[in-house]
């Protein structure tokens, strides 16, 4: 199809998720770690173009050479996509079509890359905790890659949340990084509750500097020196809901609620803060 402008390579695949490397016909654009692009495919009936935004991911390190990946040297974009139940209601889904792709298939990859879920060095952070549900790990991995590549003196804890049986497709890379970098910690957090009750309790313990929690993260969560980054399920995040103008409603659930109650503030385009988030499902 004329809309297609990129080739697909399946980097890793399981029943639950797939890592695609998308090689565009055009030169890859520079982007900030944590931002998102878009992928598109023609509908099954051939009469509609289905497009959706996806965060750009990163394998962080070459597992064979042990060299950190530098996105500026790449001729592809990497996407980490979670399988979702097929819905026959509402707009057509692109995800089931993505899971049918094979090496060499064509796809649309948008040239525009945007997003505010990025690491800003406007504060000399000593610690960063990144929490993502399922493939919400994608932008967090890109940010970890940026932090390690630039040799920033910062403690990093990267937490991936999922139910029993969920394992990050990047587990090998995380294991290698933990052995190579004393300031890097990856936690595969299992939470089978409907509303992330187990994660909430862990985070509450962590924010209270409970010994058991800080043993896992390997640093204390301190108000003036720690950046919190949250990506994925809105229920996990508890993001504020815009009511109009500058009026927001803050849910009484989620990690933002816990953080705000302990003095942390949300970062926006117009003011600084130590919570950054991006909700999607």
Spans of features found by a protein language model:
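Conserved positions in beta-strands of structured domains
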Residues: 6-11, 57
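Generic marker of residues within folded, mature protein domains
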Residues: 10-12, 46, 69-71, 148, ...
């Amino acid at each position: 199809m004329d809309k297609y402008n990129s080739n697909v390579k399946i980097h890793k695949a399981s029943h639950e998720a797939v890592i695609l490397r998308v090689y565009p016909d055009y030169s890859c654009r520079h982007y900030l770690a944590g931002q998102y692009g878009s992928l598109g495919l023609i509908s099954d009936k051939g009469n509609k173009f289905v497009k959706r935004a996806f965060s750009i991911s990163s394998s962080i390190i070459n597992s064979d050479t042990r060299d950190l990946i530098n996105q500026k040297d790449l001729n592809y974009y990497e996407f980490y996509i979670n399988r979702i139940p097929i819905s026959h209601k509402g707009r057509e889904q692109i995800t089931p079509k993505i899971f049918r792709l094979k090496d060499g298939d064509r796809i649309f990859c948008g040239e525009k890359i945007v997003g505010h879920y990025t690491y800003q060095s406007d504060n000399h952070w000593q610690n960063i905790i990144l929490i993502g549900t399922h493939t919400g790990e994608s932008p967090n991995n890109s940010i970890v890659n940026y932090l390690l590549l630039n040799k920033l003196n910062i403690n990093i804890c990267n937490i991936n949340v999922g139910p029993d049986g969920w394992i990050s497709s990047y587990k090998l890379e995380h294991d290698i990084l933990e052995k190579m970098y004393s300031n890097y910690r990856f936690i595969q957090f299992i939470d089978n509750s409907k509303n992330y009750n187990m994660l909430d309790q862990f985070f509450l313990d962590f924010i209270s500097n409970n010994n058991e929690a800080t043993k896992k993260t390997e640093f204390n969560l301190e108000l003036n020196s720690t950046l919190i980054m949250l990506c994925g399920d809105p229920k996990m995040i508890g993001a504020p809901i815009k009511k109009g103008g500058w009026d927001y409603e803050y849910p009484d659930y989620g990690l933002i609620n816990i953080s705000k109650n302990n003095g942390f503030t949300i970062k926006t385009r117009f003011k600084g803060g130590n919570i950054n988030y991006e909700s999607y499902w």
